[in-house]
Amino acid sequence: MASEKVTALLEELKGLTLVEAAELAKEMEEVFGVSAAAPVMVAGVAAAGDAPAAAAEEQTEFTVILKGAPADKKIAIIKAVREVVAGLGLKEAKDLVEGAPKPVKEGVSKEEAEAAKAALAAAGAEIEIK
């Protein structure tokens, strides 16, 4: 529960007009030496404007996704999945291939993702890297 003083102050603030509220915000910025909106707006604009370019440059972890496996190449793809994913059993690899689209490797470096993509694509799998 808020004290009576806080409750009374809150009721006073509710009664302010929009112009009075703007004046209050400006005075509070001057008195306390803070800025209410500038850092948020600058960060928001920079993040929104640079997001696509920054995401492409800064991505360090990738996910290799098995999008599809042609029926006539499933055996080769299952073998390739077992080579790419260490410690994966035959049944798990078969379930992964038959359950496509599914991630094969997650949180890997670009080089590792490219190597996995190359091995799986060579076996005939449809692969995507995100």
UniProtKB/Swiss-Prot annotation:
Coiled coil: none
GO terms classed as biological process: translation
SUPFAM superfamilies linked: ClpS-like, Ribosomal protein L7/12, oligomerisation (N-terminal) domain
Keywords attached to this entry: Ribonucleoprotein, Ribosomal protein
Gene3D superfamilies, A to Z: 3.30.1390.10, Single helix bin
Example of a GO cellular component annotation carried by this entry: cytosolic large ribosomal subunit
A GO molecular function held by the record: structural constituent of ribosome
Function statement: Forms part of the ribosomal stalk which helps the ribosome interact with GTP-bound translation factors. Is thus essential for accurate translation.
Subunit-structure text: Homodimer. Part of the ribosomal stalk of the 50S ribosomal subunit. Forms a multimeric L10(L12)X complex, where L10 forms an elongated spine to which 2 to 4 L12 dimers bind in a sequential fashion. Binds GTP-bound translation factors.
Family that this chain belongs to: Belongs to the bacterial ribosomal protein bL12 family.
Protein name: Large ribosomal subunit protein bL12
Organism: Herpetosiphon aurantiacus (strain ATCC 23779 / DSM 785 / 114-95)
Protein encoded by which gene: rplL
